[in-house]
């Protein structure tokens, strides 16, 4: 497999996408995680984390398989240079996380995806029942025209997305991808 991971530079180390779990129950077409093997992804080093300013918790599915707020608290307290922690996940598992008492005390933003009707329904429910006011850096990626209806979606920048072929996929050029030790 050819790696597409960005090189560590003074610029890219400021934004670390940290795979906190490889586990996911979905089989999304053209999932970017199919572009590399787990062994290709380097572990985040102490030096990298000491230079990081924005940490993106990703997976797999972080809301399903990790305690994301506990992870955010750990990284922010251990590395005071980390100013923002943003969690990537799907709307269904985010709603389940909230319903189980999950909190966002140390999380600064969400990057949620709607990739199924179940995700769409969960996002509609979440914005009716939960206020995302404390989360300032939120994005909602909507696939397959599954835009939530009948609700306002405040505090989220909304992006309509199409599935990219794996040949077209490019990681953000201002970040590095690492896995958690």
Question: In which residue ranges do the predicted regions lie?
Answer:
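Short low-complexity stretches enriched in small and charged residues
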Residues: 9-15, 62-70
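Leucine-rich repeat
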Residues: 45-50, 73-78, 101-103
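N-terminal [4Fe-4S]-dependent radical SAM core
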Residues: 1-18, 156-181
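Conserved strand-turn element in the central/C-terminal portion of the radical SAM core barrel
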Residues: 112, 117, 131-171
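Distinct, well-ordered alpha-helical segments
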Residues: 68-72, 94-103
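Core AdoMet radical
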Residues: 32-40, 52-65, 81-96, 106-141
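Extended hydrophobic/Leu-rich segments
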Residues: 49, 123-126, 135, 166-169, ...
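Canonical Radical SAM [4Fe-4S] cluster-binding loop centered on the CxxxCxxC motif
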Residues: 4-43
């Amino acid at each position: 497999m050819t790696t597409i991971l960005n090189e560590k530079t003074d610029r890219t180390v400021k934004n670390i996408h940290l795979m906190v779990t490889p586990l996911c129950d979905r089989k999304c077409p053209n999932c970017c995680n199919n572009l590399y093997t787990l062994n290709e992804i380097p572990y985040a080093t102490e030096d990298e984390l000491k230079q990081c300013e924005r940490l993106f918790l990703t997976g797999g599915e972080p809301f399903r398989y990790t305690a994301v707020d506990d992870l955010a608290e750990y990284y922010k307290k251990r590395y005071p240079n980390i100013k923002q922690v943003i969690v990537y996940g799907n709307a269904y598992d985010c709603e389940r996380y909230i319903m189980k008492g999950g909190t966002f005390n140390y999380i600064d933003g969400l990057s949620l995806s709607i990739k199924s009707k179940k995700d769409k329904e969960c996002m509609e429910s979440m914005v009716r029942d939960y206020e995302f006011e404390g989360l300032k850096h939120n994005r909602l990626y909507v696939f397959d025209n599954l835009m939530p209806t009948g609700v306002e979606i405040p505090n989220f920048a909304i992006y309509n997305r199409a599935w990219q072929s794996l040949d077209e996929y490019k990681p953000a050029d201002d970040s590095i991808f690492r896995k958690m030790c």
